[in-house]
Regions:
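Structural and coupling elements of P-loop NTPases
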Residues: 1-171
Length: 171
């Protein structure tokens, strides 16, 4: 899971990672399989409600949060560089509802684009664009109406952007 803006003051982004086997140690060098890059995870965290604490070690079954500078996506794998492993992907569901979404205030375009892209990277919505079109408006696809409500709420409360949503017929 990827979650943006867990701390609004810092606009941080946390990737939640389940340890599948073995032992994880703070500062351990890992391989991000999808990019092929090695990285050190220096500040893994355990989160409980609003509290965060640095974790020195984690074992199979534990879930830790790691700072994500935009490298991770849902379903990514990190492993010991000496023991590369690949998991099959996580299924995505075809959207059933579509809407054109745009910001009410054109001066909020940057916040709108960043918010929509981050929420899409978290897997809450899918974005569709027409070829050679900008980001003034986007077509958003969702599985259920609640996802539109989550999008509107998060854009307003986390990015200070109010949106106009025009539902599209399913075709």
């Amino acid at each position: 899971k990827i979650q943006a803006n867990m701390n609004k003051a810092h606009r941080d982004r946390v990737a939640f990672m389940r340890i599948c086997s073995g032992k994880f140690e703070r500062g351990q060098e890992v391989l991000h399989v999808q990019s092929g890059k090695k990285m050190s995870l220096a500040a893994p965290q355990q989160l409980m409600a609003q509290d965060r604490s640095i974790v020195d070690e984690a074992y199979a079954g534990d879930i830790i949060g790691i700072f994500d500078p935009g490298v991770f996506s849902i379903g990514d794998t990190v492993c010991d560089p000496k023991h590369k492993c690949v998991f099959s992907g996580i299924p995505t569901f075809a959207p059933e509802l579509f809407a054109v979404v745009r910001q009410k205030d054109t001066l909020k375009r940057k916040q709108f684009v960043k918010g929509v892209e981050q929420i899409a990277q978290e897997g809450a919505i899918q974005i569709f664009r027409e070829p050679n079109a900008g980001m003034e408006s986007v077509i958003v696809g969702v599985v259920g109406v609640l996802q539109f409500e989550v999008l509107e709420y998060r854009l307003k409360n986390e990015y200070n952007v109010e949106i106009i949503r025009e539902n599209l017929p399913y075709e």
